[in-house]
């Protein structure tokens, strides 16, 4: 029986490359000279922006987002937190990466597939939604219906099997 999986993943190698490019650009750009603006990564692959002012922190976030977009990483996978004051009159901002389907999002996807009226079944399996059907055309229609719903998270369709 044909099936496919709906997942929400981020290519961590592309994030790493974009992070390094953004860090180099911030170190070399004239408008960032002397502002003590820097990017750091933690173990959970989140990005911490430290800057001397809110404007420089926002500009650093824009540089990071630009580099991620050029590398093909969906910007919906970023979750920038609020700017918070740090020591020495600086500010910092944590940018979290959204990875994996949350249960609420998976339920919304299943509900969208069911309300579309296509003859397929959707089931939540861990951090993925498996959609099965009798015909390949039904599965392609389900993919189209999910894409048309415009969920606020980046979705990928994997393991399309006949």
From Swiss-Prot:
One of its GO terms (molecular function) is nucleotide binding. GO terms for cellular component: cytosol. Pfam families: DUF520. CDD domains: YajQ_like (cd11740). Keywords: Nucleotide-binding. The keyword Nucleotide-binding applies. The keyword Kinase does not apply. InterPro entries: DUF520, UPF0234-like_C, UPF0234_N, YajQ-like_sf. Nucleotide-binding protein. Belongs to the YajQ family. PANTHER family: UPF0234 PROTEIN YAJQ. This is Nucleotide-binding protein AnaeK_0101. It comes from Anaeromyxobacter sp. (strain K).
